[in-house]
Amino acid sequence: MAYLSRATATLARQDCSNGCSASYAEEEELEASTESYDEEGGSEASTQTFRAKDLIITKADVLKKKPDPSSLVFGASFTDHMLMVEWTSKYGWDKPHIKPFENLSIHPAASVLHYAVELFEGLKAFRGVDNKIRLFRPDLNMKRMCRSAVRTTLPEFDKEELLQCVLQLIQLDREWVPYSTSASLYIRPTFIGIEPSLGVKKPSKALLFVILSPVGSYFSNGTFSPVSLWANPKFVRSWKGGTGDFKMGCNYGSSLLAQCEAAENGCHQVLWLYGKENRITEVGTMNLFLYWINKDGEEELATPPLDGVILPGVTRQSILELGEEWGEFKVCERHITMDDLSTALEENRVKEMFGSGTACVVCPVASILYKGQMLHIPTMENGHKLSSRIMAKLTDIQYGRIKSEWTLELP
């Protein structure tokens, strides 16, 4: 019997006049095209995967001092152990190994160092109000990681087996999960090509590893503090047919120059635009939502579609599903241009704008610097009722204040 049920996000989206994304059903078809799946036994490639039952555990002799949850800097502290699994085209997957946290030793010609043959994921473990440790929708992260592996020509693996190994890693380092409802344990699975050759080719060697980091707020200005955005069409994050809808390091390293310019202009994050119409796509490391009154006079929660340009975020999907469940306003995946936003602001039709992501959960937007003009977004003045409600709902689920099928409890 499979450890996790498959994601069943097949909600019908409203057919918006400005164009909608491929449905979740189509996304399932994409997965089926790269993986033959059997509900009882996992993928057909399972015989070529590593197995959690073969996991080797080597415990650290000396344990590190754990940081104070109230003073955590995002991604700066790491737990005592890590998970590593090696792969070669000749022998397939080696046994997974949990070992003391250590530096990696790879060949200077490793393909990850020269050609960015790499992908990663990001999810969290939360210590609930009942002291139980929960993961939030980890099946979606594993599914996305497998999808990225296909795009990167890295070997496939059974996502359920990886999740089982990750759970054992967290179990071993469970005291690193902060005793706090404002902090969590960030989980970073990473998959790299380590082909020791300067040839540009599919790697014959790869390394999958997972590290853990106790974290507080992602933004230095604190949890649920509004951010300012810098929008400049001279920079493009992704394009159709590219890799922008995959969780790959190359998408983030190439964004740093724009992020530096945003900071120089007094803004927290980059608002990425696309095409001649300057369509809104993503915000830095977040998906973007606009809560407004649309041109038809309807109260609407809108977000850019999954058209190959933006990352299919887990938090994004969860917010769409919550909106559909509440049924209090229209929920739509649609293209939104800067002209659409500017016009709506002039006509006082914008209620809130906010970003979403694993790191921040929900982050309100206060302003956008665009073409030398600061556009004021009235998120905070309007009471940020929807973004606050979404934030409360998701964190209540994550910290166990509300029972939900979206969480996976550690035994």
Curated annotation (Swiss-Prot):
Catalytic activity: L-leucine + 2-oxoglutarate = 4-methyl-2-oxopentanoate + L-glutamate; L-isoleucine + 2-oxoglutarate = (S)-3-methyl-2-oxopentanoate + L-glutamate; L-valine + 2-oxoglutarate = 3-methyl-2-oxobutanoate + L-glutamate
SUPFAM superfamilies, per database record: D-aminoacid aminotransferase-like PLP-dependent enzymes (SSF56752)
EC id: 2.6.1.42
PTM sites of type N6-(pyridoxal phosphate)lysine: 247
Tissues in which the UniProt entry reports expression: Brain, low expression in ovary and placenta, but not found in liver, kidney, and skeletal muscle.
GO molecular function, one term: identical protein binding
Subunit structure: Homodimer.
NCBIfam families: ilvE_II (TIGR01123), PRK13357.1 (NF009897)
Family statement drawn from the similarity comment of this UniProt entry: Belongs to the class-IV pyridoxal-phosphate-dependent aminotransferase family.
Entry protein name: Branched-chain-amino-acid aminotransferase, cytosolic
Species whose genome carries this gene: Rattus norvegicus
Lineage: Eukaryota, Metazoa, Chordata, Craniata, Vertebrata
